[in-house]
Design a protein with these regions (language model features):
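Bacterial Sec-dependent N-terminal signal peptides
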Residues: 1-26
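GH16 jelly-roll
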Residues: 24-256
Length: 256
């Protein structure tokens, strides 16, 4: 037996609204690099070279590495950054999208495989595009992924602002048993009100301050992406295990 009935108009309107909202929550891919070429695409990426001197020796953190163009390669659709010790110098690679690809809001994501060893400090992060005008930390910094080899099975997600004087008070340390094994996905969902941090699609931290002044929330402007592997320093740790070198930080893709 067929029974015909009608939903009240307000319920019908609510269902339509929810369906509309659900459809519009689907993210739209606006840019990606799958590292499918034979070398890094320098129309997208810049190399930052040297040790930060003379203005920012040790990259502001007493790091020990010297960045070169020679410590990266593209193999089978992966960007591989290698850190090694050459004579008494640690060499690595640091790349950015500054001035070429800059983003404001959305989902920023990378799939990566971490290196292992004391002193190592790989990172996938962002800086405010106005850094040359206002300096750091006024420009803001978003650390989507930081890993330090002295703390196995642990990843950091952090923010730096003028209000924190650059310190990582807006930070979360997440214990993940298999983080050094295979590839994992590191991402943020960034809106005008908050930044959600994810590891393997699991929410691990949210930053959503009520105060949206520039000192607390410089995240209302374009940012650019950085990928690097540091060694030693204030956060990486001053105990470095040379016996594990060389080590590789492998990135499968970056998507926005």
């Amino acid at each position: 037996m067929f029974i015909q009935f009608r939903l009240p108009k307000y319920i019908t309107s609510l269902i339509i609204l929810l369906l509309f909202y659900s459809c519009n929550k689907e993210s739209k891919l606006i840019w990606e690099d799958n590292f499918d070429g034979t070398d890094l695409n320098e129309q997208i990426w810049n190399f930052e070279l040297g040790n930060g001197c003379p203005d920012n020796c040790g990259w502001g953190n007493n790091e020990k590495e010297l960045y070169t163009k020679n410590n990266h390669k593209i193999v089978d659709g992966h960007l591989i950054i290698t850190i090694k010790k050459e004579d008494s110098v640690y060499t690595s690679t640091r790349i950015t999208t500054k001035g070429k690809k800059e983003f404001q809001y959305g989902r920023i994501e990378a799939r990566a495989k971490l290196p292992v060893g004391k002193g190592l400090w790989p990172a996938f992060w962002m800086l405010g595009s106005n850094i040359s005008d206002v300096g750091w930390p006024m420009c803001g910094e978003i650390d989507i992924l930081e890993y330090v080899g002295r703390e196995p099975k642990t990843v950091y997600t952090s923010l730096h602002t003028q209000n924190s004087h650059g310190n990582t008070i807006n930070s979360k340390k997440t214990l993940i048993e298999d983080i050094e094994q295979g590839f994992h996905i590191y991402a943020i969902d960034w809106t005008k009100d908050k930044i959600d941090f994810y590891v393997d699609k699991k929410l691990v931290y949210t930053f959503s301050p009520q105060d949206k002044t520039t000192e607390v929330w410089p995240f209302d402007q374009p940012f650019y992406i950085l990928i690097n592997m540091a060694i030693g320093g204030n956060f990486g740790g001053f105990e470095i295990d040379d016996t594990v070198l060389p080590q590789e930080f492998i990135i499968d893709y970056v998507k926005v």
